[in-house]
Each structure stands twice: as structure tokens, then as C-alpha cells.
Amino acid sequence: VDLYKLPIPMSSIYDGGPMITAGVVMARDPEYGINTGIYRFMVKEKNLTGIDIVTTNNMRLFVQRALEANKPLPISISIGTHPIELLGAGFKAPLGTDEMAIAGGIRGRAVQLAACETVDVPYLADAEIVLEAEVLPTGWTQPEGRFGEFTWLMGGLHWNPVVRVKAVSMRRDAVYYSLHMPWENTWLMAPTRYAAIRQALRTAGVVVKDINMTMGGVTFWHAVISIKKQAGDGKNALLAALSVMDIKHVVVVDDDIDVFNPVEVEWAIATRVQGDRDILIVSNARGKPLDPSLAPTPHGIVPTTAKVGIDATISEGIPKERYERITYAYADTARITDYIGGKADREARKASDEVIGKLAEEIAAVLEKTPLYFTDVAERFSDYEFNAVARAVGLLHEQERLWQDPKGCLCLRNSVFAAKLPN
């Protein structure tokens, strides 16, 4: 075995050494079966690497159990696989569930596996390169890193177990694939977290319209979720989403908000949120060690974090009409020909007082039957110039006959439609 024969690159200038970053790792536990994930390996010698498992996950549990039994943990590392297998491996499945079963569901057929020759664990049959290895029962005792992380930041020095590579096999003219941080990794993480959040909200009985694992949240910590809301769903959605994986901050909005438009999301927060009512903070939740905002923790201790949810949906008890969107006058009906060589380009007819008075009575007759917005009045009497309609409406106001209904439509002062002054 000579790992130096592989073109394992450096990703950033402060990396601790060449890193295997895109290996799909399969491990076998005698009780829980197969677990699959993506972990990085810093090359230390021609047949020795580290394995970065500082975060609490199923692979870490497998390694810990093997350490307690003072036995090596057999693993395979499949490099150069289909993206579907990378997606599946990145999913944080329940203990005892093999992530390759999830990949098979995405693919629509079972993922093809093959048996290793030197360890009792399978590997991905379509891989370009396969490493057969063991995680030695040394514990988290060896320095490893640093490494440019998915956070867009340089990580610190980690303490990790040691991996001994026992065999290397590859295809003829094999292609070595390296996952570069943060962008490739970021886009691979987003779909798995999207699916996990959607499932959690489905279990909570919340109807989801869409989910955006935001790029600014490195598609890992931040989610913006639009829902078809029923009473109480905003808070229920927050609680469900914050329970997923390492999600840290969640914004829930109504289904009229585009979760992929940051201006709309910010607008929803600005116009629909009262901080004392709509912001939820959960302290001492399990955190991820790579979060640079966390205080340093002792070696081997999993950090805790604060999770924040913002319910930016329209609250129960708030009148829906407060959120009626602006519709611009004539935006859908205006034509350039109305203004160039058309009616608006001609000299306006000077309406006499007699014409204005007659028009005012016609408008009053209509408003006696039904309230109308000003633009509807102007449209109904479009044979008159707009200015004439405005003057006729003004005349009704001068005569103290004009009023408005609760929606702001024009009506007659003494009609059943007229708004009443609040007490």
C-alpha cells in the first residue's frame, strides 16, 4: 500500500497535509450493521491516515464501540462514485439505517456493492478507487488538520483516531475525485437537509410549500421555510425544523413569500414579527464543533449551542386585510398608444360646470347602489377625461354627499355602506 501514488491534493494553504475528502466510508458494527458517511482522511504515512470524526454521529459511535472492545473497526473508502451515493452518504440517518438504502431510493434501484478482500465490509461497486482499512483502537489521540471547512473558514487542529490502509484497488485509468470546500460540499449537503426538514414537518402535520437551505447559512445551519399555515403551525414548524440534524436558525413564512428571495424574507420578518411573541430561543441544544461562534470546549466534550426560530407568518388575530399587497393603478391596462397619438395626447376637453354637475349625479347614482374604488369610478366613466371625473367626485365631496366604506371605496355619506367613526 502506498497512498503517495494517488494524486491526493491540498485544498488550502494552511491544510495539515494532503486530504482524502470525497471518500464514501462504509463501516460495520456487530450490533447496528452498516453505516455510511463522508469523512476526510489526512495522509500521515504511505499506509496511515487520520479520520475526522469530532462531530457526534453514527460513525463516531461505531469507532467508540470498537475502541471500548479494543478492536479495530473495519471500513472501506470508495473514491469517485456517482453523486447520488455522495448525497445518500451525507444524510444523517437513524442508527441502524444504512444510508446507501436511502441512495438506492433516490436512484430508484439498489446500490451495487462488492465485498472487500481484507476487511469484512462492502464497498461501492462503481467506485474508481477503493481503500480497504481499519480504524485502529487508539482513541482520539492524534493531531490532525487544519483544514478549510464548509464554513468558509479554516478549522482548528483536531484530535482524531488513526486509520491503517490495508489494500488499494482501482480501475484502469482511474479518475481521482476530490471534494473541494466549501461549494461542492455545500450543494451536496442542501438536499439531504431539505428532505430531513420536510419529513420532520410532515410528521408534525405542517404542510410545506418550499424550503431554502440558504447559501449564507452554508446550506447547513439556516433554513427558510414557507408553509400553508393553519393556527399554531408557525411555532410547530419551528420546533420541528430545529430538531433536525444541526439546524441552528430557522425562519418560517407564509406561502405568499418566496423563500429564495432574501428581500421578501426580510420584508416578512420586518412586517410580521413581534420579537416577544415570534422569536423562539432554545438554549443548550447539541451543537457542531465546527461552529466558530461556540466557546471552546474541553477535548472530547460535545459543545452545545443556542437554536433560534423566527415565526414570520401572519399571527392569529391580525386582520388579513392589513397584508393586502399593492396593485398599481392601470398597470395591466395602460397602452403606449393611449399616450402617444392617443386620448391622453390630445388637448383635454375643458368640461364646463354643467358637464361636471351632470357627471357628479351619474357617479352618485352608481355609488348609491355599490361602493367603488376611485379607479373603478374612473374606468366606468372613461368617456370623460380623468380630470373631469376627479372634479365630479370632488363636487360630491363639496356637497357633503361623498363618503367611504370600511375598505376605502367611495360611497354616499348616508348610505348603508358608509364607514362609522370608531369610538
Say what each PLM segment does.
Residues 26, 42, 52, 76-80, ...:
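Residues in well-ordered beta-strands of folded domains
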Residues 33-39, 51, 162-165, 178, ...:
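Short, well-ordered strand-loop elements centered on a beta-strand within folded domains, enriched
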Residues 408-415:
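Minor-groove-contacting beta-hairpin "wing" of winged helix-turn-helix DNA-binding domains
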Residues 2-78:
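Internal mixed beta-strand/loop scaffold within catalytic domains of large alpha/beta enzymes
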Residues 1-12, 82-369, 373-391, 398-401, ...:
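Charged, compositionally biased interaction regions
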